[in-house]
């Protein structure tokens, strides 16, 4: 069974007793066995006969027996067959090839139709490889979407085979059927779904390949019951962002410009877009939408919805968050002395430079874009959650369970203190934060990179990409303008801008028939009162403890449309 922390949030099974995990996780010897029958692939349209037919189709299409059928769990033989697969098989044979691959590996396969994009949109299907949800394939028909999903899964498998170390020691007795959980650790699974998602969204010839080096993402984990009652987890990429800079110009007050285009910030904004979509799915999608949504109605006086039990959020970040976490020489000392270290104070990106907020002149702060560092925002999200003020009307605080940092040069101890020690919350008198806001612990992991972190000179330094589950493609934002990149001088607003979120907020309010929310005139006024109070109290604590005042920009949120 998975453990539960004090806040009721289940810790990742692979990190049940860890708060910092700089080394590789190794599976425990007490893993529950899997029924032999569970080794056969489970698909929506393929049984045993279907797998045999799929193999015949694949062999016929590729002119020979590329994947010879063998007993489920014949891992060495399956590896040899997989290494002979064509790099880019025809879409028409992808489903057959994937089915036979999984049969030989003893890994269950299920094709899941995804309707989060809503009625009238293209079909979307994803492949579930024994708990690992691969990026969705889309198409004008279910068959086309399924073929694209199979291609994506095959690309992931081939990528794993190209790793220098084997996925599993061939001499290891395979007493149980292989599953993704026994092949990959938590941090590897997070990196795998991010890597597969990037490969799906960016072709090898894409001019934005270099943007992968700054990727950050949010992975949604669902705990599901296996065939004999044991639990397993599925991992799915739901939000993604890239970028390494912010807009350096004047403040914009219409809500149509993205000021901060750092990868982690963009991924979090893409997550907000995902949850607004989920709210529409659960309210307007009927019984099927309620079943597919990750949200469930919540009785009582609080927010009307909450995450379903067994659903968790994980962050993946390629680079050490800018700001305090970058100072790997931060001395180990008492909490009070560390808090007063200059490197520990709030820092902001202003006019292309990262500097302590106390060094920013008020005239500059009130007129120019100033964005707090990613280190500071992680500390804020550990208390206020990822959801922000608009979603707070509909959902309780959305806290991430873990953070996988792929930068090999980061210092785990510094990162932990940067996130969890600022500001200091009084354990005797209480934090004075309004309910339900509390500081939560992010379980930290060192994970693998999905792309070179420093690809060299590139035009991508001035661009930011974003995507969330349900979007047909990535959106490319010009950091200098904070708008979508186009050939014209000024592009359209991004789908992640404040004005877009205010529109989504009103759409959900109408769906829930809440006229009191529709009467809120401006973006700032639309933020839930408990959230605003918690944000104000957090800013006060930071200032009182000498860490700097959280920059307030009330005029930025005064727009109405």
From Swiss-Prot:
Ranges where the record places region Disordered: 1-53
Function: Required for male fertility and normal male germ cell differentiation.
Disruption phenotype annotation: Male mice are sterile and show defects in germ-cell development.
Family classification: Belongs to the ADAD family.
PROSITE patterns: A_DEAMIN_EDITASE, DS_RBD
Domain DRBM: 90-159
Pfam families: A_deamin, dsrm
Recorded coiled-coil stretches: none
UniProt superkingdom: Eukaryota
Keywords, alphabetical: Cytoplasm, Differentiation, Nucleus, RNA-binding, Spermatogenesis
Tissue: Testis-specific (at protein level).
GO BP terms in the entry: RNA processing; spermatid development
Domain A to I editase: residue ranges: 239-560
Species this chain originates from: Mus musculus
Gene name of the record: Adad2
Any one GO molecular-function label of the UniProt entry: RNA binding
Name the UniProt record assigns to this protein: Adenosine deaminase domain-containing protein 2
Cellular component terms per the entry's GO annotation: cytoplasm; nucleus
Record localization: Nucleus; Cytoplasm
Keyword Nucleus: yes
InterPro entries per the UniProt record, alphabetical: A_deamin, dsRBD_dom
Keyword Lyase: no
């Amino acid at each position: 069974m998975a453990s539960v922390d004090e806040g009721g949030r289940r810790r990742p099974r692979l990190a049940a007793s860890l708060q910092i995990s700089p080394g590789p996780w190794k599976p425990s010897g007490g893993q529950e066995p899997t029924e032999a029958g569970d080794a056969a692939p489970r698909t929506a349209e393929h049984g045993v006969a279907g797998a045999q037919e799929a193999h015949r189709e694949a062999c016929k299409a590729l002119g020979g027996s590329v994947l010879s059928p063998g007993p489920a769990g014949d891992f060495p033989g399956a590896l040899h067959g997989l290494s002979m697969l064509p790099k880019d098989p025809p879409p028409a044979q992808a489903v057959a090839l994937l089915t036979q691959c999984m049969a030989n590996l003893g890994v269950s396969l299920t094709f899941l139709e995804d309707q989060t994009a809503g009625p009238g949109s293209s079909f979307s299907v994803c492949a579930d490889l024994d708990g690992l949800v691969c990026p969705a394939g889309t198409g004008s028909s279910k068959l086309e979407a399924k073929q694209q999903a199979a291609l994506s899964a095959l690309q992931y498998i081939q990528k794993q085979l190209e790793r220098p170390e084997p996925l599993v020691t061939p001499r290891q007795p395979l007493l149980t059927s292989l599953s993704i959980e026994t092949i990959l650790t938590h941090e590897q699974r997070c990196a795998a779904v991010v890597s597969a998602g990037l490969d799906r969204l960016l072709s090898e010839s894409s001019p934005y390949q270099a943007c992968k080096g700054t990727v950050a993402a949010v992975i949604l984990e669902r705990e599901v019951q296996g065939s004999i009652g044991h639990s397993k987890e599925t991992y799915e990429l739901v939000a993604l962002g890239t970028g390494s800079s912010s807009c350096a110009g004047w403040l914009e007050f219409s809500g149509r410009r993205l000021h901060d285009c750092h990868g982690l910030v963009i991924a979090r904004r893409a997550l907000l877009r995902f949850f607004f979509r989920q709210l529409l799915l659960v309210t307007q999608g009927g019984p099927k939408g309620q079943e597919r949504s990750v949200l469930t109605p919540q009785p009582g006086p609080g927010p009307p919805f909450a995450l379903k039990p067994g659903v968790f959020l994980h962050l993946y970040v390629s680079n050490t968050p800018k700001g305090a976490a970058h100072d790997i020489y931060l001395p180990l000392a008492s909490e009070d002395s560390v808090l007063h270290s200059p490197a520990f104070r709030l820092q902001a990106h202003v006019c292309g430079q990262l500097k302590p907020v106390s060094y920013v002149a008020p005239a500059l702060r009130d007129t120019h874009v100033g964005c707090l560092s990613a280190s500071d925002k992680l500390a804020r999200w550990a208390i206020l959650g990822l959801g922000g003020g608009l979603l707070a009307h509909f959902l309780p605080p959305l806290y991430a369970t873990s953070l996988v940092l792929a930068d090999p040069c980061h210092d785990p101890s510094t990162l932990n203190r940067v996130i969890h020690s600022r500001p200091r919350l009084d354990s005797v008198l209480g934090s004075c934060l309004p309910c339900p806001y509390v500081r939560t612990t992010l379980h930290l992991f060192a994970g693998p990179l999905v792309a070179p972190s420093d690809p060299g000179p590139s035009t991508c330094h001035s661009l930011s990409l974003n995507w969330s589950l349900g979007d047909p493609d990535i959106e490319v934002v010009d950091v200098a303008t904070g708008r979508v990149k186009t050939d014209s001088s000024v592009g359209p607003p991004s789908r992640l801008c404040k004005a877009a979120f205010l529109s989504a907020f009103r759409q959900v309010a109408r769906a829930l028939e809440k006229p009191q929310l529709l009467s809120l005139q401006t973006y700032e006024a639309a933020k839930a009162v408990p959230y605003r109070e918690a944000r104000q109290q957090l800013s006060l604590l930071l200032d009182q403890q000498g860490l700097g005042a959280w920059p307030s920009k009330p005029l930025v949120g005064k727009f109405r449309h």
